[in-house]
Amino acid sequence: MAYLTQQQLEQLHFKYLGKNVKISDKASIYNAKNIHLDDNCRIDDFCILSAGVGGIYIGKYVHIAAYSSLIGAESIILADFSGISSRVSIYSSSDDYSGEFMPHPTIPDEFRNVDNRPVYLDKHTIVGAGAIVLPGAKLNIGVAIGALSLVLGKEYPEFMIYAGTPAKAIKERKRNLLELERIMK
């Protein structure tokens, strides 16, 4: 995988650009002025980051694996030590599919009903391959989401493992990673 050079990263004019940021030269970045990238984060091949007015915040030591997307008008926050596996889609905006309104961004706003809500992944959260995270989702510290799960726009209590469509609590997650973080610092 080839990464953008420091000069190429700086030319994108991110809201904030930390140290040791690695972005694949095959990733697509839209509205970089609304994207905060902290130290030691990595964005792999074919990822899409499309920041709306709410922006995208990527914390320290965050990994976004290949083919993942972060898209929407509201904020999307991935706190320190969080990560998303391949083909994860995170949306802070979603059209109304009921038929009462018209979907799609090509339609004038007065004919649409868009669910715009922030998405928050707290420290030490991980989202498995192929999962979908919808507007309003709040994954508290230490949450793990299984592969191919559907994460609804609600709060998920800390240090639990969730899986399924929709994602449901499976079992508690160990907290040893907090001690490892302390040792690392």
Q: For the regions a protein language model found, what residue spans apply to each?
A:
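Flexible glycine-rich beta->alpha loop in the catalytic core of nucleotide-sugar glycosyltransferases
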Residues: 88, 95-96, 149-150, 156-157
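N-terminal segments that cap or nucleate solenoid repeat domains
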Residues: 1-32, 37
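Beta-rich strand-turn-strand
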Residues: 130-143, 149-153
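Short-chain dehydrogenase/reductase
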Residues: 22, 83, 126, 144-145, ...
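Flexible, glycine/small-residue-enriched loop-and-beta-strand segment within the central core
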Residues: 5, 27-37, 42-133, 165-166, ...
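Conserved beta-strand-loop-alpha-helix hinge in the C-terminal portion
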Residues: 158-160, 165-181
